[in-house]
Amino acid sequence: MATWQQGINSGGFLAGIGAQNENAPKARDINATLGLIRENNDLARSGANNVALTGLRGLAGVADIYNQEQQQKALNAFNQVHANAWATGDPSGLFKFAQENPAFVAQAQQAFSGLNEQQRNDMGDLAMKANVALSQGPEAYSKFITDNKDRLNRVGANPDWMIQTGVQNPEQLSHMLTTMSLGALGPEKAFAVQDKMVGREIDRGRLAETIRSNKAGEGLQARGQNITMRGQDMSAATARRGQDLATQRANARTISGSEGNRVVQLADGRTVSVGGKLHGAGANAFYEGIDDNGNMVRVPASAIAAPPTSAASAQNYAMKKDIDAIANADASALDFMTGMTGGAGNPAIGADVRSRLTGKEQRQLYNSAQRIQGRMQNQGVAAARDMGASGINTIAEAKMYFQGMPQVDYSSPEAMQQSIREIQEYTNNYNQQYNVNVGNGGLKSPRQQPDTQQSAGGSYTSKSGIKFTVE
């Protein structure tokens, strides 16, 4: 615990307490205040009382009281309670001490008996409020001193000295302010002022949290509307692709004159003759057919390739470009959109604004991350349909499906790049499910060719619009 050594006999209040209290401020610490009091000639000529000087003179007899053994014990106990309150940030122990030691409080109040009620209220109110601001950190304390500069000057306190002491010896200054507020106001009023001030800070925090929550809700609602619109667009596109496939199947050539049998191309480039009846449903739906080697096979409906569209090709190229941009970026270039307020799918607060201020590269990285997140949400919509859902119509449904998808992690640059690599791996695995290897589905034909002759390279697009390449 920091200790104080009495320097000179300056100021009744601090001299009285400082001689016995190792935690009290040094008397010389208020020389600037007393100098300001002596220079306040206008107030002296007008006959107005200088509040701080009057209060300090009225405390001159406190030292004699503190010399008593019983009062010394109370003072030591007060020092310990204050040290605990400062260390924990919980002032409840001080209030309890004041209730259990009324004699100590009464002696502190005697020091202010020479002031009228208004003067005591002003000094005590300023002391307690300054103490609360001091506990909230240097920025809050400096703002309080600046905002109340005139009030402090009126009671003879030098704002510059207050700021300097608050920076150099905050715990010791808090000790002095606590003692002054107890003496000027009494414990009930002093801690009522504290609770009211802290309560306002809590209310401000709650208001800010409400505003953030409302903004988040509005953003989520807008995102949900966008998801619904994208889902409707995808439904229309899926319907068009279905019509195209139906037309292709209707025009497919038949084999051996068998009605209903047709030749289709698999995602791995081979052709298979399949029957017209679809067995099963959803992801397990399949056709029965015969490959070119005479093998009886079951062909998953999802393995039948559709011709790639220019839109799908462009999207997949853009996805790869965005993933490479973030994965290969320097970690320091991602600081602007990551941090404590960032999370899964949500960039750090203010990332959009910072990306506009920090340069072209940061803006491109921010847009790349947003596009990747949007495409992963689109894949969530596709996955929902694969599970049999007709679409995503509510925010709750969207959150449920998106939780199962990899998302961009904005908590730190390293976490962001790792999540991008996981998204790339997920996309690759998602595409691989369409590279169907029919395998040994039946008896081998003598016409069987080596595996190297069975596979054909090329690019194809799945029913969900995902492009993949067979090498």
UniProtKB/Swiss-Prot annotation:
Residues 446-464 have a biased composition (Polar residues). GO terms for biological process: symbiont genome ejection through host cell envelope, short tail mechanism. GO terms for cellular component: virion component. Residues 436-471 are annotated as: Disordered. It is found in: Virion. The keyword Membrane does not apply. Keywords: Late protein, Viral genome ejection through host cell envelope, Viral penetration into host cytoplasm, Virion, Virus entry into host cell. It holds the Pfam family Inj_translocase. Interacts with the internal virion protein gp7; this interaction forms a tube-like structure that may allow DNA ejection through the host membranes. Inner capsid protein that plays a role in viral DNA ejection into the host cell. Ejected from the capsid after penetration the host outer membrane and has been released. Assembles into a structure that extends the extracellular trans-envelope channel formed by the internal virion protein gp7 and probably gp16. This channel allows the delivery of the viral genome into the cell cytoplasm. This is Internal virion protein gp20. The gene is 20.
